[in-house]
Design a protein with these regions (language model features):
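Extracellular/periplasmic carbohydrate-active domains that bind, remodel
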Residues: 1-342
Length: 342
């Protein structure tokens, strides 16, 4: 549809990165998205400027378009990131809401030349062995909290993340959610959560600084990812680029990834619970992509219990990765990997 609105028309304000401004802007942008969707679809435009924002919900028929020199900068506060039961690393678990969520939506897009910044540096722990001594010392000007492990010391951005590591409350009940609430930022979200969506386009935008994974399409159909950039620092814990889980008809091309973990990853659930649901990751075409940094360039698994099949990867360049092509498995996962062409 031709309908186009600017978030400024709905009262959004740029240049102020305070939490209250982020909440105000999120209300304005979500209202614009809702109205455009209800009127049959169209474009919600983010003009040039830095816009503080709280979590957003993308609805059917809406293209969230970021102009050149536009940035959505997500604030972080407990009130804006309630806990929920969702899927992460192949199984149901507790996480906070994501900065951007779409669920059961059709004909949606995030396009343009701007930047989505998830403020992941306020969420992510950092392992000491990944830092220089000077970098490590600088972290303590932000937070004094450190978790000592057999492997390495791990810096924590907040006390609640440190306590969350000690308690590690898990489960899929209301009681578990309530018990975990004081440690909300231990349960880091993926930045872009696309669940059970159809006809999805990600084009041109830079996705960066995610709390955990950058982009997580889950049981989506007809997904196109083109000309995007995904950027996380090399030390970003769980800083995956895109994790395509149990999706079908996927086209990823002419995109650049710099990540702290796997870059372009195919997944399909974890262990016996996942195998009860049909949904392999299938019919995926990946080409003309550049991975400058990451654990793996093109990766399958290790959550692949529903299977991964019919994948073609060609004309991609993996530079500075730990492993260019990474097939990960784990005892008991099950699942069949077949018809993979590189």
């Amino acid at each position: 549809p031709d309908r186009e609105v600017s978030i400024a028309e709905y009262g959004a304000k740029s240049g102020d990165l305070q939490i209250e401004t982020g909440r105000h802007n999120a209300e304005a942008i979500n209202r614009a998205i809702c109205e455009v969707s209800e009127q049959g679809g169209g474009t919600v435009r983010v003009p040039a400027g830095i816009w503080a924002v709280a979590p957003l919900r993308l609805l059917s028929g809406v293209n969230l378009h970021l102009d050149s020199q536009a940035m959505l900068k997500f604030i972080k506060s407990k009130e804006d990131y309630p806990l929920r039961i969702t899927s992460y690393e192949g199984q149901d678990c507790i996480r906070t809401v994501s900065p951007v969520t779409a669920k059961n939506a059709e004909n949606i897009a995030i396009t343009g030349e701007g930047i989505i910044d998830g403020s992941g540096d306020k969420w992510r722990p950092i392992k000491k062995f990944k830092m220089t001594e000077k970098q490590w010392d600088a972290l303590f000007t932000i937070s004094p909290y450190v978790l000592e492990t057999k492997e390495t010391a791990i810096w924590m951005p907040t006390e609640s993340i440190l306590k969350g590591n000690h308690h590690n409350i898990q489960g899929n009940t209301e009681e578990a959610l309530a018990a975990a609430a004081p440690y909300y930022d231990f349960y880091r979200p993926v930045m872009i959560s696309l669940r059970h969506c159809k006809n999805v386009l990600l084009q041109g935008v830079t996705f960066m600084n995610s709390p955990a994974w950058n982009i997580h399409p889950y049981f989506c159909e007809n997904l196109t990812v083109e000309h995007i950039q995904v950027r996380n620092p090399y030390y970003a814990q769980n800083g995956d680029g895109i994790d395509v889980e149990s999706c079908t008809n996927v086209h990823i091309h002419h995109s650049v990834f710099e990540t702290g973990d796997d870059a372009i990853c195919m997944k399909s659930g974890k262990n016996a619970i996942a195998r009860k649901i049909q949904g392999p990751c299938s019919n995926v075409y990946i080409h003309d992509c550049l991975v400058n940094e990451g654990h793996g360039g093109f990766v399958i698994g290790s959550e692949m219990s529903r299977g991964v099949k019919d994948i073609l990867v060609e004309n991609c360049t993996f530079v500075g990765t730990d492993v260019g092509v990474r097939m990960k498995s784990a005892l008991g996962r099950g699942g069949v990997v077949e018809n993979i062409t590189l």
